[in-house]
């Protein structure tokens, strides 16, 4: 994440917190980010310097006025005016990071060799909440190369309980063992 994204995303969070709009702005940013991720040509158009700023601002108004909070629309216009609209995704990440910190939320991804049943995901979430004392937002992903077990991806570290990891550890130990 760039310094620009941290600065702008943090400033937007500060404003939203001051106005008690954290949840609404978070939802709007997620929606805008999803649309821009799905429509890279639209983002490219909004970032094209040969298109006058007023025209780009008009395109933003046309697409988003009434669909997102005015703070989000004005934030997008500010990024557009400053030539940093491509940083919106990073700004949204920083906003989410600040939101999670303020609301004691920890995002965790469980990576497994096969898809976990919903009841197992719920048990894992409950166990993580009990251990961390935070609300866990758990997502999952399948990676067949893991063979078995679970890899937990947290913002600041990974907890690797996969079969692949343990096999690599055994291999490393055997390589370093003198017979």
Question: Language-model features: where?
Answer:
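Elongated, mostly alpha-helical coiled-coil "stalk/stator" tethers of large membrane protein machines
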Residues: 1-179
């Amino acid at each position: 994440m760039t310094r620009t994204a941290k600065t702008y995303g943090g400033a937007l969070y500060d404003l939203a917190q001051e106005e008690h709009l954290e949840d609404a702005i978070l939802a709007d940013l997620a929606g805008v980010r999803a649309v821009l991720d799905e429509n890279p040509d639209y983002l490219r158009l909004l970032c094209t310097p040969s298109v006058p700023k007023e025209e780009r601002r008009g395109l933003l108004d046309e697409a988003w006025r009434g669909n997102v909070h005015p703070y989000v629309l004005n934030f997008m216009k500010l990024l557009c005016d400053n030539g940093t609209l491509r940083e919106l995704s990073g700004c949204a990440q920083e906003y989410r990071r600040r939101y999670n910190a303020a609301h004691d939320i920890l995002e965790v991804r469980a990576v497994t060799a096969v898809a976990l049943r919903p009841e197992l995901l719920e048990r894992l979430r409950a166990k993580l909440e009990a251990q961390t004392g935070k609300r866990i937002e758990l997502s999952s992903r399948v990676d067949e190369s893991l063979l078995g077990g679970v890899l937990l991806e947290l913002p600041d570290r990974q907890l690797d309980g996969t079969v692949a990891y343990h096999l690599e550890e055994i291999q490393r130990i055997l390589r370093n063992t003198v017979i």
